[in-house]
């Protein structure tokens, strides 16, 4: 089973990691767990000033701040995982990575907004649900 776990470093995404570590036996024998950090794109004007090499380094650093503690938490619980980052808008990027990687399951936190607030303010989780075919 391939499991995608998008995280952003928030308390809500930490709950996703806790969920995976506490329920590892329910996820099947040797599940393939991939952590994903979606980085917001730097505005075009700024990226021209920064340059591609520095921009890539910036994205690497930002993603590592989020991904490394999660990998360590999973490792401490005996759960193997890989990690990657992608640049883009959160929901469509998560859905795209899930499709490309053949993920069977996406485990992600939710901010716990009410249905009305989610409708009015939007929800990454709801958008991912709407965008995924599986």
Indicate where each model-derived feature is located.
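Active-site-adjacent beta-strand anchor residues
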Residues: 6, 84, 109
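Small/aliphatic-rich secondary-structure junction motif
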Residues: 1-53, 77
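Structural beta-alpha unit
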Residues: 72-106
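Class I S-adenosyl-L-methionine
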Residues: 21, 64, 68-75
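Gly/Ser-rich helix-loop-strand patches that form or flank binding pockets
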Residues: 96-134
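Aromatic/hydrophobic pocket-lining residues that form π-stacking "cages" and hydrophobic walls in ligand
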Residues: 20, 70, 94, 128
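A short acidic, glycine-rich active-site loop
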Residues: 53-65
């Amino acid at each position: 089973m391939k499991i995608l776990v998008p995280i952003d470093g928030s308390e809500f995404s930490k709950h996703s990691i806790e969920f995976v570590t506490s329920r590892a036996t329910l996820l099947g024998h040797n599940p393939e767990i991939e952590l994903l950090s979606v980085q917001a794109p730097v505005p075009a004007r700024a990226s021209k000033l920064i340059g591609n090499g520095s921009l890539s380094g910036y994205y690497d650093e930002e993603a590592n701040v989020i991904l490394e503690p999660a990998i360590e938490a999973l490792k401490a619980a005996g759960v193997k995982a890989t990690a990657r980052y992608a640049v883009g808008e959160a929901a469509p990027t998560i859905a795209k990575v899930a499709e490309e990687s053949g993920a069977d399951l996406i485990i992600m936190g939710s901010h716990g907004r009410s249905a009305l607030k989610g409708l009015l303010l939007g929800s990454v989780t709801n958008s991912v649900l709407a965008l995924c075919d599986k």
